């Protein structure tokens, strides 16, 4: 394990003033057997820690940095915008510019509301769905992550019809989670039993899902499952909400809605839409969105919602992804890294599964294709922790969890992709 004395000292100091020394738990690297990274700066595809060590970055601020770190066009636009002021709590014209850009790209979005985090976006979308339908139950799926609002932090029951959930965090009253139904992802028959059950069928306000899950590893919804959900929501009078905080503008220009021939009623965005700044959004059909205050009776607000600095970064981010050949080049780089690894795994029949959606992917240490949370939990986390440390010591940073997505950016250098590929293949050859 490489020595990082300055990181160690700073982390010790952080622990005195911040719980666990981090402001989001996954950053602690708790299951990786080492202290977390402490970053000094970054550029393009490279992180530099406070000890001066460099790392090729496959986290990319958890998918937000599709253009890489410190993209010059985004930085220049943000610097010019900051000269006008940083925050007003009053409307600015750039909010409309970014809104128009999203509406132009996403067919299902007719109006949009900006917020500051993915949690705010999903939380507000659910409140809006309940207000629109005048129903109370929400359906989510095991392993899908929609932020940390109380009604999302739910554990499923032990059987298909045991839908009385329990909270997955302390501090959440039991009554809060009673109206969240947590069902198996990609399981049509299990969902059908609930959707047609007399206790729930006419009480479901919305179904929310990640069309391509990214927080239990990269796991796409099947086309059949997605079409089933759209059919059932229409029949029940419920809304279908896509959580595209991760997949939006990542897997394709139109996000997952480029991949599935299904149009949701509401979509949640984050990460790329903020260009590396704290911004997120939710949008959908005009008749639904017009229920938001001040037009309607569904309340949603935020002091920093539509912050002009974040809007500028987001606008530049979305303009960059529309350049000719952007996604073709992004996917070429991803394939350059992954294809030889996939071929070697297949040739040797190793118990490893790489699941990919465009430029996001997960390397699962398990034999069979992963379709849901139950499959994902079969992956060998001990091997993954060893894998993480081995790559880290060679200057390669991947998300510190078996059940997270990796990301390629437009800024990744081919030489760094080849370096990473070689390190991965060496580890696999030595351990399988």
UniProtKB/Swiss-Prot annotation:
One of its GO terms (molecular function) is transaminase activity. The gene is hemL. Its main location: cytoplasm. PANTHER family: GLUTAMATE-1-SEMIALDEHYDE 2,1-AMINOMUTASE (PTHR43713), GLUTAMATE-1-SEMIALDEHYDE 2,1-AMINOMUTASE 1, CHLOROPLASTIC-RELATED (PTHR43713:SF3). Pathway: Porphyrin-containing compound metabolism; protoporphyrin-IX biosynthesis; 5-aminolevulinate from L-glutamyl-tRNA(Glu): step 2/2. This is Glutamate-1-semialdehyde 2,1-aminomutase. Signal peptide: none annotated. Homodimer. The modification N6-(pyridoxal phosphate)lysine is found at residue 271. It catalyses: (S)-4-amino-5-oxopentanoate = 5-aminolevulinate. One of its GO terms (cellular component) is cytoplasm. PROSITE patterns: AA_TRANSFER_CLASS_3. It holds the Pfam family Aminotran_3. GO terms for biological process: protoporphyrinogen IX biosynthetic process. Its cofactor is pyridoxal 5'-phosphate. InterPro entries: 4pyrrol_synth_GluAld_NH2Trfase (IPR004639), Aminotrans_3 (IPR005814), Aminotrans_3_PPA_site (IPR049704), PyrdxlP-dep_Trfase (IPR015424), PyrdxlP-dep_Trfase_major (IPR015421), PyrdxlP-dep_Trfase_small (IPR015422). It is an enzyme of class 5 (isomerase). It is found in: Cytoplasm. Its EC number is 5.4.3.8. Belongs to the class-III pyridoxal-phosphate-dependent aminotransferase family. HemL subfamily. Keywords: Cytoplasm, Isomerase, Porphyrin biosynthesis, Pyridoxal phosphate.
């Amino acid at each position: 394990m490489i020595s990082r004395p300055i990181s160690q000292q700073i982390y010790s100091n952080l622990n005195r003033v911040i719980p666990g020394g981090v402001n989001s738990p996954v950053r602690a690297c708790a299951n990786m057997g080492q202290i977390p990274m402490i970053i000094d700066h970054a550029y393009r595809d490279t992180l530099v820690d406070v000890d001066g060590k460099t790392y090729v970055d496959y986290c990319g601020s958890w998918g937000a940095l599709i253009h890489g770190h410190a993209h010059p066009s985004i930085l220049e636009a943000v610097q010019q915008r900051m000269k006008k002021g940083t925050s007003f709590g009053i409307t600015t014209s750039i909010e409309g510019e970014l809104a128009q850009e999203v509406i132009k790209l996403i067919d299902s979005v007719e109006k949009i509301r900006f917020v500051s985090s993915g949690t705010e976006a999903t939380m507000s979308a659910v409140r809006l769905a309940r207000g629109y339908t005048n129903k109370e139950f929400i359906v989510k799926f095991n392993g899908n992550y929609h932020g940390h609002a109380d009604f999302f932090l739910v554990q499923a029951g032990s059987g298909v019809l045991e839908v009385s959930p329990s909270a997955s965090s302390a501090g959440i009253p039991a009554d809060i989670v009673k109206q969240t139904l947590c069902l198996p992802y990609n399981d049509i028959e299990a969902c059908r039993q609930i959707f047609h059950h007399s206790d729930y069928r006419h009480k479901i306000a919305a179904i929310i899902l990640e069309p391509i899950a990214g927080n239990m590893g990269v796991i796409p919804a099947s086309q059949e499952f997605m079409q089933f959900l759209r059919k059932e929501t229409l029949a029940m009078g419920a809304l279908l909400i896509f959580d595209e905080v991760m997949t939006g503008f990542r897997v394709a220009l139109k996000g997952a809605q480029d991949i599935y021939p299904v149009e949701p009623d509401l979509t949640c965005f984050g990460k790329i839409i903020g260009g590396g700044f704290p911004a997120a959004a939710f949008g959908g059909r005009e008749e639904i969105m017009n229920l938001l205050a001040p037009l309607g009776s569904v309340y949603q607000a935020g002091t920093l919602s539509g912050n002009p600095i974040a809007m500028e970064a987001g606008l530049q981010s979305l303009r960059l992804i529309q350049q000719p050949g952007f996604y073709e080049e992004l996917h070429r780089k991803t394939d350059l890294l992954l294809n030889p690894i996939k071929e070697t795994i297949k040739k040797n029949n190793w118990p490893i599964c790489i699941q990919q959606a465009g430029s996001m992917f997960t390397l699962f240490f398990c034999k069979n294709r992963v379709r849901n949370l139950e499959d994902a939990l079969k992956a060998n986390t001990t091997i993954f922790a060893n894998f993480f440390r081995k790559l880290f010591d060679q200057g390669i940073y991947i998300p510190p969890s078996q059940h997270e997505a990796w990301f390629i950016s437009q800024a990744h250098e081919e030489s760094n992709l080849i370096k990473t590929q070689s390190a991965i293949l060496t580890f696999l050859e030595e351990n399988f």
